Design a protein with these regions (language model features):
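Intrinsically disordered, low-complexity terminal regions
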Residues: 1-263
Length: 263
């Protein structure tokens, strides 16, 4: 169990060939890394855990598990479980071939590129999260976020910066947006629980679109449903000059309904 003195936030780079990664950020002055085989009875997993490299120098943490070219139907890829405890506000970069990535606590910028697996981020200064197959969930992001998945859903609970979200097949949900949002999916619903300011560009080919606008915010609408209904449930407000904030909404769906409401 490697342990390093880290009185300040670190820059962590993790390369995982197969298995799960859990990053936990807290107010602490050290960094602890634990690596275990996913299956302690698998010789391949045990060997992969033993060969996983953990290095630290000058504020930079490097964790790298061995890559094996073996095909899944010939026994599968060796798998490890990595648990990292580090100082809050640390920067995290992850590259993963197969496995879930879970980040807890308050982090700096977080960048995750995965082929297969879910991505969960508790709180970050900024987010880049992409997976080919899996869900992306962000509880809170203080800055901008870019998230995408080919097959899976995307959910952001609160964003203070701008969002760019895209999925080929899956729903996109933002509970509260304080900045602009661009959200596109081919097959799925797009839902913004509450928009405060900025612009919303919401598009889906097959699915409903819903946008909630905070009380006191004026809204400019440009919406169209090719085969569906458009419902504007906004309560009247004064002109834009009287509103606290303004949001511009452009919503499109080929097959589905569009609902714009107060939130």
């Amino acid at each position: 169990m490697p342990t390093f003195d880290t009185p300040a936030p670190v820059h962590a780079r993790v390369d995982v060939s197969g298995g799960s990664l859990r990053v936990r950020a807290a107010d602490r002055s050290d960094t602890v890394v634990e690596v275990h085989p996913s299956d302690p009875h698998s010789s391949a997993d045990v060997q992969a855990a033993q060969q996983t490299r953990v290095e630290y120098a000058a504020g930079r943490l490097l964790i790298s598990s061995p890559r094996r070219p073996r095909l899944h139907f010939f026994g599968g890829m060796p798998s490890v479980e990595i648990d990292v405890c580090l100082p809050a506000d640390s920067v995290v970069e992850v590259s993963s071939l197969a496995g879930d990535v879970d980040c807890e606590g308050r982090l700096g910028d977080v960048r995750v590129d995965a082929r297969y697996g879910d991505i969960r981020i508790d709180r970050a200064a900024g987010v880049h999260a992409r997976t080919a197959a899996g869900d992306v969930t962000v509880a809170a992001v203080d800055g901008d976020a870019d998230a995408g998945t080919a097959y899976g859903g995307i959910r952001v609970h609160e964003a203070r910066g701008d969002l760019r979200l895209d999925s080929s097949c899956g729903d996109i949900t933002v509970d509260r947006a304080l900045g602009s949002v661009g959200a596109t999916t081919r097959y799925g619903e797009v839902r913004i629980g509450q928009a405060v300011r900025g612009s919303l560009v919401l598009e889906t080919a097959y699915g409903d679109v819903e946008a909630g606008v905070r009380e006191g915010t004026a809204a400019w609408l440009d919406v169209a449903a090719g085969s569906g209904n458009v419902r504007n449930l906004l309560t009247p407000t004064g002109g834009p000059e009287d509103a606290e904030e303004t949001v511009e909404i452009r919503a499109r769906t080929a097959y589905g309904d569009i609902v714009i409401r107060r939130a």
